Amino acid sequence: QSTIAKRKIMRTQTQPLGYYDRELTKQQRDLKEVFDFMKPRADHTDINQWPDSTSFREVMIRFFDASSTVAERTLALLYRAITRLQIDSAELPAGDPRTSTVRLNYYPLSDPLSTAEQTTTPSLGAQALGQHTDPGVLTLLLQDDTGGLQTYSLKNGWVDIQPSPGSIVVNLGDAMQVWTNDTYKAALHRVRPVHKKARFSTPYFFNPGNDAVLKPLTQLSDGPAVYQSFKWRDYIKARV
């Protein structure tokens, strides 16, 4: 779609969903365009901003529902591995599709902002997407064959996550790091700039419920707690 069409559904300070082309990571602008949406509420209230395409909306909602199912199954398997089948995963904290989001990422070859717009926004960072961890429970990522995604390893430094057809990359988030008391760390990752062709990726961010409390859980870790208790609602507000 044209820039004009995309900016009709531009994110604002009061509307965090929709299109955006000046995302910041650690105060540096990322070289990407995004479209964020959530599942419409049970009362059919839709807080999303959608482009003028009914079929697009329908496909995205089906994708969201399928991603929620995969995320729930992935978390259950992760809990089984951590607790070695000693605890029913139903007794452990869950993610909540009502607070989760899908993002469509587009990494262009050049800056999507005009020269004039570039003068009034933060400068581009060295990466297409600066290094960061995701705040939630876990992230499911679909990526095309372009490459560029890297994750940080204490042993090997930055490691390329090579695209593999039909695969889903799973990143653990900050919530899981807290629940496991640092036994499992949130994945520090970034995206390198693309040079030959644009890159597309689609993450599903599986987040705790709004009223969820984040604290180390004895069922998932040993030793003294390294985090104090705090609410997800407060944490995500501080991250924005």
What residue ranges belong to the model's regions?
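Peripheral, non-catalytic segments flanking oxidoreductase cores
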Residues: Q1-V240
